[in-house]
Amino acid sequence: MKLSMKLKLITTDYQNQVLLDTMQRFNSACDYISDIAYNNKVFGQVNLHHLTYYDIRDKFGLGAQMTVRAIGKVVESYKIEKKYKHTFKPFGAIVYDSRILKFKFPDKISISMLEGRQVIPFIFKNYRDIDIRRASGQADLVYHDGIFYLVVCVDLPEPPQDDTKEFLGVDMGIVN
């Protein structure tokens, strides 16, 4: 069973500013990629990658994997609707994967930004008995009301199924 968990990042003023700059630059790159995709009617990951990768690296100064994630974000948005050019909010979410985000258990992450990697502490409300070490796959960096959150997917084991040996049948009558 998979659950989403929201981790609150405890950033310094410097980290906060660099994350904001990273978000703006990432989403500006997405707008640029979207413009090329729409004008050339190229919406597939591989073809769009060949058209834009080196351009994005040079113009926006994003790292290799951040550039790939930006292209992926645009490709995903065009899977839904291809008739209109898509735009991205300056502080829209960034999708991180295991190459640009690492957990430093029990309470820190190492996250890639424009200025390199930073180690940032996090906190979360443990409503259930969830082991954060089970976080897997991608995570979304979200900015809301001046606070950064990381939304991660946690893979939980399936609860055991009860083996029922007896049962009771109830006659509900005949329905015509």
Give residue spans per PLM region.
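Nucleic-acid substrate recognition interfaces
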Residues: 1-176
